[in-house]
């Protein structure tokens, strides 16, 4: 049975849950929690629940949701629906600018705006000439910077975990993800990019144009930096090319498996995939997304192999 805590109080025995699904991803997607309580007697309304309240779900053998924050409460026939996510405060569009700064400085400040603490794992502090948040939320800016710096990040329990991709791939396995012959599963692989070229166009009086590449000739990924990011020079551009190349290739392969049990993994976990029917899929992998259905005790786990 799942344990549901609302504002620090265990309410599991006081509510009849008909839906409880936690969906968490890496790559800067915010974990979400969707619940439905059957409440024929109208008790829930007397609790004065409101957006911003804290809620958490845990179950034996499953990854816990960590603290989530209510974003929407909807009375429905015979009950209530609650939607929550892992951000303590909404990601409100804003205009901010940093000059002669570094990746960790900007990432830390963007996380703080969201009510999060940034923790860096194996990340180099990449310099930037300037970064501008241009009437948009903090999350997309942070995601872009992480991509250029060769990092990914996920949000969990009040913390933005920013991980260098090579650091994440070097971690030891924390367990086994079994893909049984009877399981519903899929894995896709697309051709990997071998070269990334980035063109930073010149802006009069602001920056010079820079073109840089990383990799080997073959299947090229070409990109442009918009006016919200300014690099210091060619060496930094090459690092950005490497980061963008790694990010693009990570998205070109991956799979999932459905299970009749809850997943113990959270995004970013390293595990060992065992697939008897397709041994080529077996080996070390990084979990990229988890969807735990606490009420039906089922899960869907997405992963990508570590080359």
Language-model segments: what does each one mean?
Residues 56-83, 272-297, 302:
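Short beta-strand and beta-hairpin "edge-sheet" elements
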Residues 38, 42-44, 98-101, 260-263:
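Short, surface-exposed ligand-recognition loops at beta-strand->loop->(often short) alpha-helix junctions
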Residues 48, 66, 144-148, 189-191:
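Short solvent-exposed loop/turn micro-motifs enriched in small/polar/acidic residues
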Residues 1-8, 143, 155-157, 164-298:
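Acidic, small/polar-enriched beta strand-loop surface segments
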Residues 98-100, 303-307:
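Glycine- and charge-enriched low-complexity intrinsically disordered segments
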Residues 1-91, 180-182, 254:
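Assembly/oligomerization scaffold segments
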Residues 77-183:
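Charged- and aromatic-enriched interaction segments used to assemble
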């Amino acid at each position: 049975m799942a344990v549901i805590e609302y504002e620090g109080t265990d309410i599991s025995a006081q509510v009849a849950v008909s839906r409880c699904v936690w969906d968490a991803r890496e790559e800067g997607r915010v974990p979400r929690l969707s619940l439905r309580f059957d409440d024929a007697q109208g008790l829930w309304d007397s609790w004065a629940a409101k957006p911003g309240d804290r809620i958490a779900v845990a179950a034996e053998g499953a990854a816990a949701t960590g603290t989530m924050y209510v974003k929407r409460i909807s009375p429905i026939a015979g009950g209530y629906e609650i939607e929550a996510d892992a951000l303590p405060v909404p990601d409100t569009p804003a205009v901010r600018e940093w000059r002669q700064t570094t990746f960790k400085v900007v990432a830390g400040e963007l996380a703080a705006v969201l009510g999060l603490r940034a923790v860096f794992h194996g990340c180099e502090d990449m310099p930037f000439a300037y970064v501008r948040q241009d009437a948009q939320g903090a999350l997309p800016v942070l995601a872009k910077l992480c991509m250029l710096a060769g990092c990914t990040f996920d949000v969990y329990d009040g913390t933005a975990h920013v991980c260098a991709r090579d650091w994440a791939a070097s971690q030891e396995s924390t367990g086994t993800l079994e893909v049984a012959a009877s399981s519903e599963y899929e894995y896709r692989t697309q051709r990997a990019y071998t070269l990334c070229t980035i063109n930073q166009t010149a802006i009069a009086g602001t920056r010079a144009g820079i073109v840089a590449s990383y990799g080997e000739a073959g299947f090229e990924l070409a990109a442009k930096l918009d006016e919200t990011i300014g690099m210091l020079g060619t060496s930094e551009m090459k690092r950005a090319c490497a980061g963008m190349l790694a990010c693009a290739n990570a998205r070109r392969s991956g799979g999932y498996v459905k299970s009749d049990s809850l997943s113990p993994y959270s995004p970013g976990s390293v595990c060992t995939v065992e697939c008897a029917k397709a041994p080529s899929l077996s080996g070390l992998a990084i979990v990229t997304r988890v969807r735990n259905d606490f009420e039906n005790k089922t899960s869907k786990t997405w992963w990508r192999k570590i080359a």
